[in-house]
Amino acid sequence: MFRRLIGVVVATALLTFQLIVGSATALELDEATRTVPLNAQGDTVTLSLKQVKEGKRLFQYACAQCHVGGVTKTNQNVGLEPEALALATPNRNNIEGLVDYMKNPTTYDGVEEISEIHPSLKSADIFTAMRNLTDKDLESIAGHILLQPKILGDKWGGGKIYY
């Protein structure tokens, strides 16, 4: 009888705590964290919380199969970390650069088009995950890619040592 009473008290305490705390909510990111480079000229844009959430969802849908954790499964030397994006030609360390890449991907040095082997809007007939993505969707995905180093630090694009 006493054990049952203890169990009821503990269950009541846990449920009361749950009501007070509320349901689990996503981490609220401040404006400074959500501000990412817009273009190569240095302009910036602050992503809305909706864009952050949508960018994560779309990245998981269309990109994470090959780029989980910001690495590139097919080429471990080139990931989605800020340094690699900045050294690409043209630069991919901003929203416009990444959107351009998702529309028409090129090799790291920018010399050859690789839309036949990398998902893009240009190759949406081959890579169906890209088929219904809009420019707004691509901007959200790019925002997600640029935001992750601010949240995860070196773990984003860090490779096997972190996963």
Curated annotation (Swiss-Prot):
This is Photosystem II extrinsic protein V. It holds the Pfam family Cytochrom_C550. Binds 1 heme c group covalently per subunit. GO terms for biological process: photosynthesis, light reaction; respiratory electron transport chain. Keywords: Electron transport, Heme, Iron, Membrane, Metal-binding, Photosynthesis, Photosystem II, Signal, Thylakoid, Transport. One of its GO terms (cellular component) is plasma membrane-derived thylakoid membrane. Heme c binds at C63, C66, H67, H118. It comes from the Bacteria. Residues 1-26 form the signal peptide. HAMAP family: PSII_Cyt550. The gene is psbV.
